[in-house]
């Protein structure tokens, strides 16, 4: 919409994150059909498919084939192990190359992955871990932190490799933002009338309507 009116410098991706409950909502069905029909290729939706909802497991109440449904709606469908960082990265790379259709990345995930109870038993894929603090669901927080590779005595420590990763990414994003701002400034200088029109789009003011 924006790129068609104001140029390719406005071309960007829109990311949405949905859960099993979200994907079941009727409003999402209509939105999905429209997005596929219009070929909204700048839309990338990540679906956290953990088969858990508020009171039951999803497969107890729903037998839909989500992958086939979105394919029928003209979506680019990518199914991955949503607990695997490399698969997520690869899926996002592929989704950003799509130029004809919206993309849904179906990430098959495990609710409460790595969580343990006080006896060391697994709390993964438990309906009780949905919608409330894990401790209220019977998860032993210290045991879980240790199981996930952390230190229960210092649970909020930031590992050095994480600091390095985010510092590198921060630099990349600062450079990217500077480039986009320069593109915008050049476009505004060359297209003053459209630049004013764009400002009205984000001004929060209602358009004037001739009744």
Regions found by a protein language model. Name each.
Residues 1-168:
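Glycine-rich ThDP/TPP pyrophosphate-binding loop and its adjacent helix/strand module
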Residues 1-15, 163-211:
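Thiamine diphosphate
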């Amino acid at each position: 919409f924006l790129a068609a009116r104001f140029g390719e410098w406005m071309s960007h991706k829109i990311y949405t994150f949905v859960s099993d409950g979200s994907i079941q909502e009727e409003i999402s069905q209509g939105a999905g059909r429209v997005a596929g029909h219009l070929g909204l290729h700048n839309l990338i939706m990540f679906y956290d498919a953990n088969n858990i909802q508020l009171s039951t497991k999803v497969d107890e109440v729903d037998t839909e084939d989500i992958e086939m449904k979105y394919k029928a709606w003209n979506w680019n469908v990518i199914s991955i192990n949503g607990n695997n960082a490399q698969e997520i990265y690869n899926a996002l790379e592929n989704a950003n190359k799509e130029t004809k259709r919206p993309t849904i990345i179906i990430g098959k995930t495990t609710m409460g992955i790595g969580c343990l109870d006080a006896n060391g038993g697994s709390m993964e894929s438990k309906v009780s871990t949905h919608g409330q603090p894990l401790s209220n669901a019977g998860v032993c927080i210290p045991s879980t932190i240790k199981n996930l590779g952390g230190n229960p005595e210092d649970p909020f420590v930031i590992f050095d490799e994480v600091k390095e990763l985010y510092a590198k990414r921060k630099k990349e994003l600062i450079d990217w933002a500077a480039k986009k701002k320069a593109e915008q400034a050049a476009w505004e200088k060359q297209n003053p009338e459209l630049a004013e029109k764009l400002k009205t789009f984000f001004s929060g003011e209602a358009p004037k309507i001739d009744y």
